[in-house]
């Protein structure tokens, strides 16, 4: 089941989310916006099982990686005007 995975620019490039993902949905790509010069990317969202281990592993105060389960995404879209 595919879920929506969003990477925010608060990512510090620590790779914790990438290492926590059991289905290799995430990978690091070059980015000049942080000291680590890399940011998480989610090129394989079709493999996301919605376990949210990436969210749990994120050390930032504002989660830099968020998984929106299919039901959450649908509900949010239904409320948009």
From Swiss-Prot:
Coiled-coil stretches: none
Cofactors required: [4Fe-4S] cluster
Gene Ontology cellular-component terms listed: chloroplast thylakoid membrane; photosystem I
InterPro entries, per database record: 4Fe4S_Fe-S-bd (IPR017896), 4Fe4S_Fe_S_CS (IPR017900), PSI_iron-sulfur_center (IPR050157), PSI_PsaC (IPR017491)
UniProt GO molecular function: 4 iron, 4 sulfur cluster binding; electron transfer activity; metal ion binding; oxidoreductase activity
UniProt-listed Gene3D superfamilies: 3.30.70.20
PROSITE patterns linked to this entry: 4FE4S_FER_1 (PS00198), 4FE4S_FER_2 (PS51379)
Keyword Mitochondrion: no
First-tier enzyme category under EC: oxidoreductase
Subunit structure: The eukaryotic PSI reaction center is composed of at least 11 subunits.
HAMAP family on file: PSI_PsaC (MF_01303)
Known function: Apoprotein for the two 4Fe-4S centers FA and FB of photosystem I (PSI); essential for photochemical activity. FB is the terminal electron acceptor of PSI, donating electrons to ferredoxin. The C-terminus interacts with PsaA/B/D and helps assemble the protein into the PSI complex. Required for binding of PsaD and PsaE to PSI. PSI is a plastocyanin-ferredoxin oxidoreductase, converting photonic excitation into a charge separation, which transfers an electron from the donor P700 chlorophyll pair to the spectroscopically characterized acceptors A0, A1, FX, FA and FB in turn.
Name the record gives this protein: Photosystem I iron-sulfur center
Species of provenance: Sorghum bicolor (Sorghum)
């Amino acid at each position: 089941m595919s879920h929506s995975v969003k990477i925010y620019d608060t990512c510090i490039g620590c790779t914790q989310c990438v290492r926590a993902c059991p289905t290799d949905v995430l990978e690091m790509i070059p980015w000049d916006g942080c000291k680590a010069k890399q940011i998480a990317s989610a090129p394989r969202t079709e493999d996301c099982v919605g376990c949210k281990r990436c969210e749990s592993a994120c050390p930032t105060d504002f989660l830099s990686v968020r998984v929106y389960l299919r039901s959450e995404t649908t509900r949010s879209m239904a409320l948009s005007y």
